Curated annotation (Swiss-Prot):
Chain positions with 3'-nitrotyrosine modification: 68, 209
Subcellular locations according to the entry: Cytoplasm
The protein's name: Triosephosphate isomerase
Assembly, per entry: Homodimer.
A single cellular component GO annotation: cytosol
UniProt cross-references to CDD domains, sorted A to Z: TIM
Modified residues (N6-succinyllysine): 149, 156, 194
Catalytic activity, EC: 5.3.1.1, 4.2.3.3
GO molecular function: isomerase activity; methylglyoxal synthase activity; protein homodimerization activity; triose-phosphate isomerase activity; ubiquitin protein ligase binding
BP term (GO), one: glucose metabolic process
């Protein structure tokens, strides 16, 4: 019997919001029904991690959107996993396509960050995904498997890892992978984990989808057997995020 994977919904607020509007969003989330079978995590901008943790109901966890690969030091503008934990956050998003493509983070650096964050006791939402030209060239699998390998090489305990598949061409573009496209990649990723890690990890690791997820698209995506939740961008700042949290209901 395959283990039941708890549905996981992450809200990535990116570089958005001020205390007033985020406070209003938090009030909406605190009043929302969060199903017992769903884990919800919100990732505010670094400046608002403490604010979000103090205001959010304990049923919703808090994540950082990034961290560095060491504990302390002369790294201007960076934040360490220890600092993130000190603020009450328990997760970190690593390898997001915007970190890869806007800020030039390499697979190697992302792997080092994953290793350090896990060693420090944070849960990791590890992001992978292909660009449009890579999908059109037919190398989606090659790209996401290479990205996954670097992450896997740095993971000792998979119970603290959620894999987020985000086709880069679907992020912030309004284009969503079809449920069938998402399922196909998720199924292949689970197969990769089975072949390259082990069957237990493949069965228990949650693989979530990111890329223009909305209240309108979430239910059909959530019905796919290998889609274990979502990493939501723009829609996580709107009341429809509550609909996405309840996509399995």
């Amino acid at each position: 019997m395959a283990p039941t994977r708890k549905f996981f919904v992450g809200g990535n607020w990116k570089m958005n919001g001020r205390k007033k509007c985020l406070g209003e969003l938090i009030c909406t989330l605190n009043a929302a029904n969060v199903p017992a079978g769903t884990e919800v995590v919100c990732a505010p901008p670094t400046a608002y991690i403490d604010f979000a943790r103090q205001k959010l109901d304990p049923k919703i966890a808090v994540a950082a959107q990034n961290c560095y690969k060491v504990t302390n030091g002369a790294f201007t503008g960076e934040i360490s996993p220890g600092m993130i934990k000190d603020l009450g956050a328990t997760w970190v998003v690593l390898g997001h396509s915007e970190r890869r493509h806007v800020f030039g983070e390499s697979d190697e650096l992302i792997g080092q960050k994953v290793s350090h964050a896990l060693a420090e006791g944070l849960g990791v939402i590890a992001c992978i995904g292909e660009k449009l030209d890579e999908r059109e060239a037919g190398i989606t699998e090659k790209v996401v498997f290479e990205q996954t390998k670097v992450i896997a090489d740095n993971v000792k305990d998979w119970s603290k890892v959620v894999l987020a598949y985000e086709p880069v061409w679907a992020i912030g573009t309004g284009k969503t992978a079809t449920p069938q496209q998402a399922q196909e990649v998720h199924e292949k990723l689970r197969g990769w984990l089975k072949s390259n890690v082990n069957d237990g990890v493949a069965q228990s690791t949650r693989i979530i989808y990111g890329g223009s997820v909305t209240g309108a698209t979430c239910k059909e995506l959530a019905s796919q057997p290998d889609v274990d939740g979502f990493l939501v961008g723009g829609a996580s700042l709107k009341p429809e995020f509550v609909d996405i949290i309840n996509a399995k209901q």
